[in-house]
């Protein structure tokens, strides 16, 4: 787990990922010297190892949400979990395990497999900035793309909103059940952005063992991370053909409208719960915490939802602590 803890030690706030990118490139040069590593103008890193007609491909993102990362930040590792801590400030601090866990999996596999592609995106937490401008020709000889960027331990994301990510054949061939995974709908991430841009191969996003993401209470359960790595290895070794997939939606605009109102309704429930406990919360604060995953809602809609929810408050309270990420 030494490499994982080295990744956790690097603060890589969205928009300030250069240090992480430099670490990844140096690590690859030292540990996978035969790999070809290229970086685009945004900072996305594209890695190809070996020569083959087609490649398995892994994706991850190198930015994180947490703004606090003290100079004395350390990783505390127990038998089951890893968390971040500042001894001087006597407080827990976020690891950035979303998505350093995915970066770790990709680096481990690059070292292990002689023919593999991997891509490390910038700016995922700010709306998939890197993947929205990524070079799609990099994926032309890929069999599939697997991203490890989901909280928990059992989700295999096959749909993001109404955007299907993979073929049934690929899903079956992954044999995900052997590893305790289940198909699940997910939220915006890089493979979803690639599919929206027209990537015509199967993609999935896997739970990779981090919990309480985007918060200072974030932690990693090691056995869940290792189980994700085991599934990724299994897919690389057993899914040895190209798995084409095109999301043919004739009613995309209608689906997006439905998704928008679905997000609106979900956020209405969330704000009701939040406001009952934190009556001083602002629309700007809600947008900052939830806007990444409720990306179809505008700031004005957050204001509207907040005003509607205020009418339902029974007992006002006092905002004494940060809003927990849901």
Protein language model annotation of sequence segments:
Residues 279-301:
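Acidic, low-complexity, intrinsically disordered interaction modules
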Residues 48, 52-115, 125:
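Active-site metal-coordination/substrate-binding segment of hydrolases
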Residues 3-6, 10-53:
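A non-catalytic alpha/beta surface segment that caps or lines the substrate-entry region
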Residues 182-228:
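Zn-dependent metallopeptidase/amidohydrolase metal-coordination segment
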Residues 30-39, 77, 81, 177-183:
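Short secondary-structure junctions
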Residues 212-280, 307-324:
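His/Asp/Glu-rich mid-to-C-terminal helical/loop segments that flank catalytic regions of hydrolases
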Residues 91-169, 178, 183, 190-191:
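Acidic/histidine-rich catalytic neighborhood of metal-dependent amide-processing enzymes
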